[in-house]
């Protein structure tokens, strides 16, 4: 078994500083001015490193980053990369994680998460905080727990997503999504879930003006719906009005508000 070459407290500049690096352990190193320092790298471990310029990890594979920092100009940092784990790190740069597969994020903050996690496949997130619009657009096969998100248009077009114990302050969340299940979470934002297919909310608190319209197959169980104007309505509702502690669901049949089946579980606050 080959021992990994180690770098300690380096200050690396210039384009492609460690291009096609393989079997490396890199400690407390600053990747300063210079694009694509680890492009096409393989089997890399990063500990306490800092990325200060663009495109650090493109077309890379088998990457582990712990206690690392992507500064604002480290934008578009991880694209077209497979099998990457980032833990206990801060990513200030926008447009990170694009068309990646097998992504694991644990205890990561994204203070500028605009256009982050686009078109990714196989994403696991635990204890992530993100602020920015269009988070996780068109990504699929995601398992997310304890995500706190401040940003609109999240999960647009996402497929096969499971969220647990999350807090989403997001207008237009889950638009055009498919096969999304949310457990024990708080969601606040207008127009939740429009044009989605197979959206399930279980044990959630939802505050959404005109939310959940034009949905095909909506399931809600043990949910609280707060401060709601006209929202999800469909043929499956059994009465014209179902009163809740926190609002009214208006069931107006044959108006095309929601498509096909909506299921309102008897235990829900609806």
Which residues does each PLM region occupy?
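Long, distal/terminal scaffolding or interaction modules
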Residues: 1-270
């Amino acid at each position: 078994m080959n021992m990994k070459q180690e770098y300690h407290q380096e200050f690396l500049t210039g384009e492609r500083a460690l291009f096609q690096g393989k079997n490396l352990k890199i400690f407390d190193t600053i990747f300063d001015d210079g694009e694509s320092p680890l492009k096409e790298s393989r089997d890399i471990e990063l500990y306490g490193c800092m990325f200060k310029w663009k495109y650090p990890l493109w077309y890379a594979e088998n990457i582990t980053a712990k206690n690392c920092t992507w500064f604002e100009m480290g934008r578009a940092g991880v694209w077209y990369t497979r099998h990457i784990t980032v833990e206990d790190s801060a990513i200030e740069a926008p447009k990170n994680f694009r068309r990646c597969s097998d992504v694991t994020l644990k205890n990561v903050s994204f203070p500028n998460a605009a256009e982050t996690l686009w078109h990714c496949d196989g994403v696991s997130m635990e204890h992530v905080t993100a602020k920015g619009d269009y988070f996780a657009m068109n990504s699929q096969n995601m398992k997310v727990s304890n995500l706190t998100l401040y940003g609109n248009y999240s999960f647009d077009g996402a497929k096969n997503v499971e969220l647990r114990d999350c807090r989403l302050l997001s207008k237009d969340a889950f638009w055009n999504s498919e096969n999304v299940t949310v457990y024990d979470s708080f969601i606040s934002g207008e127009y939740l879930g429009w044009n989605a297919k197979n959206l399930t909310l279980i044990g959630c608190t939802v505050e959404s003006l005109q939310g959940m319209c034009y949905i095909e197959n909506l399931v809600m169980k043990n949910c609280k719906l707060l401060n709601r104007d006209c929202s999800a309505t469909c043929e499956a509702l059994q009465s014209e009005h179902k009163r809740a502690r926190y609002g009214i669901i208006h069931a107006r049949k044959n108006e095309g508000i929601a498509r096909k089946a909506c299921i309102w579980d008897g235990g829900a606050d609806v």
